[in-house]
């Protein structure tokens, strides 16, 4: 059960703002010193660990063997604003997230995600598709030599966080699966459970708890032979949704509390 209080707000909000401000300033300093983008992402990973510790949120991960070391699209069900810190903690590569353009206007936070190269999602579907396609093309061309971090394009295919207390997923947007097919990028499905209990949609105070991340077996566009590009993207969409839904069911069965 969620327990929000003035005491929690007075403790959490200043701490979060301090961490975000410090991280942003450190990253800007790294840019001045011409640090590599990989080193800057390392800074973001460290910041994420501090944030999770501050909020008393634990991340439990299974299926790490399914996190392939090649450019890919990560698809996860969207439960909470904690999904991004959870993935940054789980995925040690260079994760590029999509964020609504409004988030880039938030003081301190917006500048921070811009520096990290987060992708601006527009209300115009055609413009968003073009931006995502360019991002997919960019990570596909990344050379993984000299210990470079593996790039992943992280997308929440529902497009918005769920409000359903039973974690029922919303409709998946097909556009990203067309992009996966176009650029022949594998999809790594991740099922996530627990974020909604820490901070539901619309809330900005956090309860302590655990987020369970289950990395599932990747799906490869080239495995769908003998069908049109449109049919291939539809099959990829349906199979990704089923895989995440099945994984989510397993997490709920293993970790939900009675009542």
Where are the regions that the model predicts?
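Generic structural signal for helix capping and beta-alpha/helix-loop junctions
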Residues: 69, 105-107, 130, 163, ...
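Non-catalytic C-terminal accessory region of glycerolipid acyltransferases
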Residues: 2, 6, 133-259
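Membrane-anchoring hydrophobic helices of lipid-metabolizing enzymes
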Residues: 1-72, 85
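Residue-level detector of anion-binding/catalytic polar loops
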Residues: 58, 119, 186
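Hydrophobic alpha-helical segments of integral membrane proteins
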Residues: 43-51, 55, 109-112, 135, ...
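Catalytic core of membrane glycerolipid acyltransferases/transacylases, capturing the structured
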Residues: 22-30, 70-126
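Structural motif
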Residues: 125-134
